[in-house]
């Protein structure tokens, strides 16, 4: 799907920011930030160290589940595995939404509803992190923007440098064209996630769940269109 990475980047930014502001600084879309927060918590800074520790196995389980789902569809067209992964992640985000509503108002980081919300949300984002690794496709990373921003800056330097060879400039232009929509989408998704939680609470998670359900539906529709064009 043409804009799949852009939509997924917005989903990641939305979910990661919502979980951060709602669940004591928890990052659900990646584990790097949680390692930092666990270290800070071990030294007596911050709170929610049990929550951060509990979501790491959930992230691992999400990656494993993604791999198992992809293996189950290994003998079929790639879009079927993609549709399954998007659908499973959408269901998990609905579970995150339900657990978050149950946990509200969030006051204790080690309460069962809060732990469950963090675990389900991180499980969902573990699936998204593993998705492009278990089903090969052309695209850009959509859950963590550090590498994308770094590459985009390097490409801009190449594009603006007078001595850049034409072949390097062409490659840089093509990469930048792929990178910047995901970067902008992640930033917009992050803003929307924070605002969504402020005004809607955990109900705001319905938005990324619907977006993923749409991607799941479009995976089959796009494949059907291509098949008809080649018929």
Residue ranges and their predicted role:
Residues 1-231:
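Alpha-helical transmembrane segments of multi-pass membrane proteins
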